[in-house]
């Protein structure tokens, strides 16, 4: 829909959690749109639970993940999609912004499908995280590979090898003590760029009409201003 209303935007703002270079002169790569609760010192694990954000296509990994958590004396808090049969140590959590944030900030580690926004938050707070991209989701596979290369506390789980031993092996490769890139909140920068763009557009409206701005974030969709 945004491409329909703004097929050739004068300015494109793309939110990513990685230090990427734009490939067009009218494109700007911004940091993730961080929620206020996320900052570098926000992660405070309590030794009580693991958090998972999963969708139907990757739920076959759940038994091994829940068993691993159980062996280590942890509850598994599950967000997203749920299976018909839920292991005893799994708590199916309803969709809740505040609940998810609190559980994420206090979890020992997390597992997720490598969405851009969530990976940006993971990169910001430094929580150990395992990515399981959904089958056929090329963007998630790219996100997972970039996150694994960028952050010492992010690993990728092989889609066909899920066991307690494999999870132990993956988690053993994660480092929470190594230096990691500083993730900047992209929301303020986005607002400043939009304000500058609109001010310039107003000043030049009599001679140079603009086609709009395209702001791209994965989980929150695309937004256009024209």
Show which residues each predicted segment covers.
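A nucleotide-sugar donor-handling region in carbohydrate enzymes
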Residues: 1-58, 81
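Hydrophobic/aromatic beta-strand patches that form the interior of the parallel beta-sheet core
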Residues: 11-13, 28, 77, 93, ...
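Short, acidic/turn-prone active-site loops that include or flank metal/cofactor-
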Residues: 34-35, 80-83, 96-98, 134-139, ...
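C-terminal amphipathic helix plus adjacent low-complexity
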Residues: 168-226
């Amino acid at each position: 829909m945004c491409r329909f209303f703004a097929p050739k935007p004068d300015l494109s703002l793309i939110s990513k959690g990685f230090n990427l270079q734009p490939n067009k002169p009218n494109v700007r790569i911004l940091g993730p749109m961080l929620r206020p609760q996320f900052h570098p010192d926000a992660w405070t694990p309590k030794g009580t639970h693991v958090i998972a954000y999963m969708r139907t296509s990757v739920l076959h990994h759940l038994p091994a993940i829940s068993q691993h958590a159980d062996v280590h004396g942890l509850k598994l808090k599950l967000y997203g999609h749920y299976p018909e049969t839920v292991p005893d140590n799994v708590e199916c959590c309803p969709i809740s912004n505040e609940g998810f944030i609190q559980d994420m900030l206090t979890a020992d580690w997390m597992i997720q499908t490598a969405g851009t926004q969530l990976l940006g938050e993971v990169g910001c707070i430094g929580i150990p995280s395992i990515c399981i991209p959904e089958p056929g989701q090329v963007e998630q596979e790219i996100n997972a590979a970039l996150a694994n290369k960028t952050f010492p506390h992010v690993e990728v789980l092989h889609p066909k090898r899920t066991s307690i031993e494999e999870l132990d092996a993956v988690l053993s490769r994660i480092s929470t003590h190594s230096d990691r890139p500083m993730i900047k909140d992209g929301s303020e920068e986005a607002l400043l760029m939009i304000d500058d763009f609109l001010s310039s557009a107003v000043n030049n409206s009599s001679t140079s009409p603009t086609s709009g701005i395209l702001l791209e974030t994965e989980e929150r969709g695309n937004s256009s201003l024209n």
